Amino acid sequence: MDDNKRPLYLPFAGPAILEAPLINKGSAFSEEERIFFNLEGLVPYAIETIEEQASRAYDQFRSFNNDLDKHIYLRNIQDTNETLFYRLVQNNISEMMPIIYTPTVGLACERFSKNYRRNRGLFISYPNKDRIDDILNNSTRQKVKIIVVTDGERILGLGDQGIGGMGIPIGKLSLYTSCGGISPAYTLPITLDVGTDNPQLLEDPMYMGWRHPRIGGEEYAEFIEAFMQAVHVRWPDTLIQFEDFAQKNAMPILERYKDRYCCFNDDIQGTAAVAVGCLLAACKAAGTELNQQRIAFLGAGSAGCGIAEAIVAQMVSEGISDEQARTQVCMVDRWGLLLDNMPNLLPFQQKLAQKCANIQNWNNFSDNISLLDVVNNAKPTVLIGVSGVPGLFTEEIIRAMHSHCARPIIFPMSNPTSRVEATPKDILHWTSGQALVATGSPFEPVVVDGETYEIAQCNNSFIFPGIGLGVLASGARHVSDAMLMASSRALAECSPLAIDGTGPLLPKLEDIHAVSKHIAFAVGKVAVEQGLTLPMSDEILQQSIEGNFWKPEYRRYKRTSF
């Protein structure tokens, strides 16, 4: 029987019900419920449906003049009535996703302490490091199955936001529910408050976090270890998603824990998975294979290198050697093209640095080999931007790329919109509409020579909700590389571009539920094949996916004694 058809038995009544966001129905409580739960007179007389409530809420949403106010309004609904919040978002997903997540969430993080209204999630501060178990036990969520955790050091492209980074876990988990059908009762946002190196926050009298420079080294590592162990004891089967950790910590944390616990890093692995899915769809539209592409990256941090490694793995799966695949990938950062003779490269960068011997025949390049030098010599067919610096994909670079590639694949993926390497409008005009474009933030359709081009948002929300649903439905103990690769292929299979040559690389957000279920099945199937969960048939896996897919509908309540 569908959970939404079963009555929910509650041992309390009166105002306490109206103060519980997971339970509150507001004006939708039936006459019987109002009597049994002592709610008569506490809500207006009229009994409304959830759609009537959502219609009123949407009118109120539209009355706000700026996106931050809209964000705050939606968060207030979420903190009052989560079922209504998710029905409202589900009904208006394309309009509201940029409000509850990127790009608006960046401003919400910057103003988190100033706009703080009500608690949500857990703040685990370093001075309380010996009481992490107690803090986890304080959570109002008892059956946590997915945690999104950040330390606030690298929030989007905005840098260190301290505890203001909590906006990211809250936003991500909102997408797990609205896109992936994960019950909000199973989600928990957590911020690890290890101080901040942002002087504006340290000097801000309203800042609500621990006023102390960030800890590092052994202190930081021991704190993370204590947190991971405590979570595993409290909720041994939960999926932990790492979010917006600084480059120096993100990869080491992932490497340390990915084989010990069920966890993944969305900035590294989720971004990589959605980028590869986009690339596979673009290659199919261009009539070629990924292993035939030459790829240039602008940005060689953990996210960029994570994408590059995922691309290499996919190329290898298509039949070329690992060594050959790496010669086809050029990583450019602020110091130019990464070369194997460069000092101070991070371990994950060293594996992607080009051998100096590979560029001996290049012409007219500077001491620090620029992106334009790479475009003119390596002649890439794919250009991916994860630099966080706006405007670096110049007209000269894009036109140079188009001169040797009829249908260049160009992904300016930096967030938020203000930090994008080039706008889709410019890219499509510079390439006469021939570029295959996907971006990290939402953009309006572009018209070139009378043709309208929909712009795909290469957003992790197309991937991580499906991964989470697949892990929950299958009971996977770990998130393997093969599961992530399966998610990319499943996403590519959903691309509308195969049907419409001017369509977007990725599906519409209105189709996100079907996409997430498709990805969840692919992820869960690989988990079963790899022995990361109990054996189950495809039919049972599909049933589990449907059974775990929560819908924003009110349940009937019955009263029970304590």
Curated annotation (Swiss-Prot):
Active site: Y101, K172
Residues the record lists as binding a divalent metal cation: E243, D244, D267
Statement: the UniProt record of this protein carries the keyword Transcription: no
Site feature Important for activity, where: D267
GO biological process: malate metabolic process
GO CC annotation: cytosol
EC number: 1.1.1.38
One function term, GO molecular function aspect: malate dehydrogenase (decarboxylating) (NAD+) activity
Reaction it catalyzes: (S)-malate + NAD(+) = pyruvate + CO2 + NADH; oxaloacetate + H(+) = pyruvate + CO2
Coiled coil feature spans: none
UniProt xrefs under CDD domains: NAD_bind_1_malic_enz (cd05312)
PROSITE patterns, per the entry: MALIC_ENZYMES
InterPro entries in the record: Aminoacid_DH-like_N_sf, Malic_enzyme_CS, Malic_N_dom, Malic_N_dom_sf, Malic_NAD-bd, Malic_OxRdtase, NAD(P)-bd_dom_sf, NAD_malic_enz_proteobac
Cofactor(s) this protein cannot do without: Mg(2+); Mn(2+)
Pfam families for the chain: malic (PF00390), Malic_M (PF03949)
Record: residues binding NAD(+): R154, D267, N415
NCBIfam families listed in its UniProt record: PRK13529.1
Assembly: Homotetramer.
Name of the protein in its database record: NAD-dependent malic enzyme
Gene for this chain: maeA
